[in-house]
Amino acid sequence: LKGIEMEKGGMKTDVLEDVLKSSSGQKLIYVIPNFQNPTGDTMSAEKRKAVYELACKYDAVILEDNPYGKLRFAGEEVESIKSLDTQGRVLYSGTFSKILAPGLRVGYIAGPREIIQKIIVCKQVSDVHTNIWAQLLCYRFMTECDMEKHYAGLREIYRKKCSLMLDNMDKYFSAKVTYTKPEGGLFIWATLPDGSNMMDFCTKAVRDYKIAVVPGTAFMINES
């Protein structure tokens, strides 16, 4: 498992190419292109095209995970990597847990049949099948409710929450702290000044102010 450095608009494609070039065997590129967890950043159209071209060049498969795509409350939608796929090397996945209820652990995946068949076997080994009642709830919701109206309501809820959070960060945070301003999704990534101790910060936040902050090291391959 190799982490790829991030920058505004997505992963650094030159670093990705170096990793792909030096890797042998089967290669899988995992991306969350929209409102990525944990940065809240969205991969640009140019980055998506570059990642797909690198996958083609080095015979890699892309897993495009899009759990937050329907939660865009600002800006313009960016076409999926899957929409660029002419070689059958992109798997596209999503979930109902972010748009219906967190407890509904129901997801979906689209991709080449030969890969999907292998995924089905792995899924069956893992838990036989997804909870039938959860699947039925999702089915009934999709077929009997106005999904677009539901999405619009969710977007407004998260727009207000994000705006409130950013307004307070603008008001109370030091100018030395930088942070992302997402156009959707659930996440904001804050960067403390050089020399700060992240674990001390998180401990003090929860102990003194009852605010839980997830340290960035939790999302790093090398915990740097």
How would you name each of these model-derived features?
Residues 1-224:
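PLP-dependent class I/II
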